[in-house]
Design a protein with these regions (language model features):
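Structural motif
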Residues: 60, 67-69, 76, 92, ...
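Short acidic-glycine-tyrosine-enriched beta hairpin
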Residues: 74-89
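Ligand-binding loop in jelly-roll beta-barrel domains
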Residues: 89-113
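A short glycine-rich, His/Asp/Glu-containing loop-to-beta-strand
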Residues: 17-48, 106
Length: 117
């Protein structure tokens, strides 16, 4: 069994990766990426807002924990731990955190704007 404090080119440990504050009550951790796909962990405090935005990337999201009001293309749904959703390219979307929680986002292609310069 390997300790949790290790990383490699193909594996990462959340103990070694930095959290980036991206808004009030909102932070993200880029877990890994290549030229085609990116895995991102997003932590929300209750009341935090992922403001409505759009991008040309495909996005699939898994709700690890918490409760969220998610809006995609004008349609709102309440989602909780264990739920997931897909956002097609250029679809307006956003979320309001109703109970503190975490999302796992997968983007294709890579969100270059998330990478440190």
């Amino acid at each position: 069994i390997r300790p949790r404090d290790w990383s490699s080119d193909v594996c990462s440990s959340d103990l070694e990766l930095q959290w980036e504050v991206v808004g009030e009550g909102l932070s993200r951790q880029v877990m890994g990426y290549d030229g085609q796909i990116m895995l991102v962990k997003v932590k929300f405090e209750k009341g935090a807002i992922g403001y409505v935005h759009e991008h040309y990337h495909s996005q699939a999201t898994y709700v690890v924990s918490g409760k969220f009001e998610v809006m995609i293309n004008g349609e709102k749904k309440i989602l909780e731990g264990g739920d997931g959703f897909y956002i097609e390219p250029d679809a307006p979307h956003g979320a309001v955190c109703l109970e503190s929680g975490m999302l796992i986002d997968v983007f294709s292609p890579v969100r270059a704007d998330f990478l440190k310069k």
